[in-house]
A protein has these predicted regions:
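Rieske [2Fe-2S] iron-sulfur-binding domain
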Residues: 1, 6-62, 66-77
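C-terminal catalytic domain of Rieske-type non-heme iron oxygenases
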Residues: 48-51, 55-275
Length: 275
């Protein structure tokens, strides 16, 4: 099987290099002009890759090794327990915003703002200004409680199901936000987009069962649309205002409260990584 992975297009002709899925160079157009080229020496760069805990892990530097359990520490047990290999990709959307990529990640790292900013959307579902926090190296886990968690008060602990009654937010340092949302999984892969004041993110939704029926598709479409509306109409306008304030130079620094440990940890990890 061949796969087109690189192409250069000009008004008067098209040049397309063909590579195997393995990365080996398969063919060169007008190969007579490259008669001395050894195709075996001009394949794509090989990167370390591993499938573990239902996820695909890639290191962007050739020659390095991957040890997921060592890197993720105790969070590996969480990933294994989620049985992610049973989940199914439903949809991915790409968003752009006029703010630094770290502000996108910040959006998920405190519940301080829920009762005010998300009064009609998330506040009826999740408790505001209440969350647990755990760090594992530069990575982190923050768990917000759903209002339904009160139903566990009289249940034996053996019957507790935390996933059903919480939103479990992980940051796989530095730029992946991973959220277990009761009945589905969200991932946010966030990147700079040209300069420090712009960002691009790929938002994916995964479901525990394939969405094959029309009712299932309507249900997951509603979930995805609610997610998009919440971040684009509530979170991002505020965050983009924060970005404008940063750019104006009116503040030399910002202060995180004791009720925002995930934010403090994330920015401390960024600072340590770039020293």
């Amino acid at each position: 099987m061949r796969k087109v992975v690189a192409a250069r297009r000009e008004p008067w002709h098209v040049l397309t290099m063909l590579y195997e899925h393995s990365g080996a160079l398969k063919s060169i157009p007008f190969k007579e002009g490259f008669s001395e080229i050894d195709k075996s020496e001009h394949g794509l760069r090989s990167l370390p890759i591993l499938e573990q805990h239902g996820l695909v892990w890639v290191v962007p530097s050739p020659g390095e090794s991957i040890d997921v359990d060592s890197q993720m520490g105790g969070f590996s047990e969480d990933l294994e327990a989620f049985e992610l290999s049973n989940y199914h990709h439903y949809e991915t959307r790409t968003l752009r915003a006029n703010m630094n990529w770290k502000l996108v990640v910040d959006t998920f790292l405190e519940t301080y703002h829920l009762d005010v900013l998300h009064r009609e959307t998330i506040a009826p579902i999740l408790h505001g200004n209440t969350a647990t926090f755990d760090a594992m190296g530069p990575h982190l886990r923050m768990i917000g409680a759903r209002k339904t968690i009160a139903s566990l008060r009289d249940e034996p602990e053996a019957n507790w199901n935390l996933i059903e009654h919480s939103a479990m937010v992980y940051v796989f340092f530095p730029n992946t936000v991973f959220i277990m949302q009761g009945d589905h999984l969200e991932t946010w892969r966030v990147y700079p987009d040209g300069d420090t004041g712009r960002s691009k993110m790929h938002v994916s939704l995964y479901t525990p069962e394939p969405a094959v029926s029309e009712s299932a598709k309507r249900y997951w479409d509603k979930n995805m649309n609610l997610l998009m509306a919440t971040v684009q109409e509530e979170d991002f306008p505020l965050a983009q205002n924060i970005q404008r304030d940063f750019s104006s130079g009116t503040q030399a620094s910002i202060v995180f409260g004791r009720n925002e440990p995930a934010l403090s940890h994330f920015h401390r990890a960024i600072r340590d990584a770039v020293r």
